[in-house]
Curated annotation (Swiss-Prot):
MF GO annotations: RNA binding; tRNA (5-carboxymethylaminomethyluridine(34)-2'-O)-methyltransferase activity; tRNA (cytidine(34)-2'-O)-methyltransferase activity
Chief localisation class: cytoplasm
Assembly: Homodimer.
Cellular compartments annotated: Cytoplasm
Catalysis: reaction(s): cytidine(34) in tRNA + S-adenosyl-L-methionine = 2'-O-methylcytidine(34) in tRNA + S-adenosyl-L-homocysteine + H(+); 5-carboxymethylaminomethyluridine(34) in tRNA(Leu) + S-adenosyl-L-methionine = 5-carboxymethylaminomethyl-2'-O-methyluridine(34) in tRNA(Leu) + S-adenosyl-L-homocysteine + H(+)
Recorded family membership: Belongs to the class IV-like SAM-binding methyltransferase superfamily. RNA methyltransferase TrmH family. TrmL subfamily.
Protein known as: tRNA (cytidine(34)-2'-O)-methyltransferase
A biological process from GO: wobble position cytosine ribose methylation
Matching CDD domains: SpoU-like_TrmL
Residue sites binding S-adenosyl-L-methionine per the record: 83, 105, 127, 135
Pfam families xref list: SpoU_methylase
Keywords: Cytoplasm, Methyltransferase, S-adenosyl-L-methionine, Transferase, tRNA processing
Length: 162
């Protein structure tokens, strides 16, 4: 199972859409606080529809609590990929493995330097875009990367019709 990690997400409909994505792809969702909304926000519920009960969601007090809980060592982060416009390899150049962690920053500011600086260059990846584009919508970016990783893994758990 792939792991989607949202660091301090700010916009409830984006997180709701990602909850629905997790329910449909079997990904586990990790939410690192503080969140920019309350967990009972109507916009979050509306975007996620009734998929909340089908998604595996873990809340973490902060980034260090996430690393500790998931037994990831920030000095040797194994299979933790940060999505950033500052990354070099494209998301499609990674050979994904089950249980990889895909880390996304908040919508308005991206991941902080202390997180990016702790990761090796090959674990800071980007989604290719036009040169004059700043970034993609968070829920769209998560979908792009998750479906590429899931495709590489052979869509485990998916209902495929040949």
């Amino acid at each position: 199972m792939l792991n989607i990690v949202l660091f301090e997400p700010e916009i409830p409909p984006n997180t709701g859409n990602i909850i629905r994505l997790c329910a449909n792809t079997g990904c586990q969702l990790h939410l690192i606080k503080p969140l920019g909304f309350t967990w009972d926000d109507k916009r979050l519920r509306r975007a996620g529809l009734d998929y909340h009960e089908f998604a595996d969601i873990k809340h973490h007090h902060d980034y260090q609590a996430f690393l500790d809980s998931e037994k990831l060592d920030s000095t040797q982060p194994a299979r933790l990929f940060a999505l950033t416009t500052k990354g070099t390899p494209a998301h499609s150049a990674v050979s994904y493995q089950a249980n990889d962690y895909l880390l996304f920053g908040p919508e308005t500011r991206g991941l902080p330097a202390y997180i990016l600086d702790a990761l090796p260059a090959q674990q800071k990846i980007r989604i290719p875009m036009q040169a004059d584009s700043r970034s993609m919508n968070l829920s769209n970016a998560v979908s792009v990367v998750v479906y590429e990783a899931w495709r590489q893994l052979g869509y485990p758990g998916a209902l495929l019709k040949e």
